[in-house]
UniProtKB/Swiss-Prot annotation:
This is 60S ribosome subunit biogenesis protein NIP7 homolog. Required for proper 27S pre-rRNA processing and 60S ribosome subunit assembly. GO terms for cellular component: nucleolus; preribosome, large subunit precursor. One of its GO terms (biological process) is ribosome assembly. SUPFAM superfamilies: Pre-PUA domain, PUA domain-like.
């Protein structure tokens, strides 16, 4: 595992800031113990520094995963968040969307969220903003990007698109062989 380059860090943190805002600093400057981000085979991992030091004896070829995978860099250099980071996104999310029970399964099958399935949305959520989706019982079920602001959502018809799908907990089953 290696530290990220400056360009990789810039791309990664821009994507992360879109979802959790300035709370990114809370991920790195934790009170319990220091954590860091490391790259292994184009995947970014969030790992404690103590665990990182202990893993230095393991050869790169033998190391599959270490810590929590936040996502991966594509061949074009873009960063794609992975569903495995949902716990951290949900904990520090700036903007949240709650999904009605009737639309939860549709979301978990990889579909976008329509206005008819929107339970609640954080006030003053802008358009094209990263959001974390929750069930009405406050269980995180995925993340996406809003298509409209909170103010615009109130005036939409029930079949209008509200949140573009980006990741959901159903990916654990659909993509279990590549995770």
């Amino acid at each position: 595992m290696r530290p990220m380059t400056e360009e990789e860090s810039k791309t990664f943190f821009e994507k992360l800031i879109k979802f959790i805002g300035k709370n990114v600093t809370l991920l790195i400057q934790r009170k319990d113990e220091p954590y860091c981000f490391r790259i292994q085979k184009n995947k970014v991992y969030y790992v404690s520094e103590e665990l990182m030091k202990r893993s230095q004896n393991i050869p790169r070829e033998g190391l599959c995963s270490l810590g929590t995978c936040f996502g991966r860099f594509t061949k074009t250099g873009k960063f794609k968040l992975n569903i495995t980071c949902l716990d951290y996104l949900a904990q520090y999310a700036k903007y949240k969307v709650w999904v009605k029970p009737s639309s939860e399964m549709s979301w978990m099958y990889g579909n976008n969220l329509l206005k008819a399935g929107l339970g609640r949305i954080t006030e003053d959520t802008p358009a094209n903003q990263g959001v974390v989706l929750f069930s009405m019982n406050d269980v995180p079920i995925g993340f996406g990007v809003t298509s409209k602001s909170t103010h615009e959502c109130r005036k939409l018809d029930p079949q209008a698109l509200v949140v573009y799908h980006y990741g959901d907990v159903g990916e654990y089953l659909r993509d279990e062989d590549i995770m």
